[in-house]
């Protein structure tokens, strides 16, 4: 499983 880091909006 891959960890998705929060992307800056």
From Swiss-Prot:
The keyword Iron applies. It is an enzyme of class 1 (oxidoreductase). Its EC number is 1.15.1.1. GO terms for molecular function: metal ion binding; superoxide dismutase activity. It catalyses: 2 superoxide + 2 H(+) = H2O2 + O2. Binds 1 Fe cation per subunit. Keywords: Iron, Metal-binding, Oxidoreductase. Its cofactor is Fe cation. Destroys superoxide anion radicals which are normally produced within the cells and which are toxic to biological systems. Homodimer. Belongs to the iron/manganese superoxide dismutase family. This is Superoxide dismutase [Fe]. It comes from Anabaena sp. (strain L31). The lineage of its organism: Bacteria, Bacillati, Cyanobacteriota, Cyanophyceae, Nostocales. The gene is sodB.
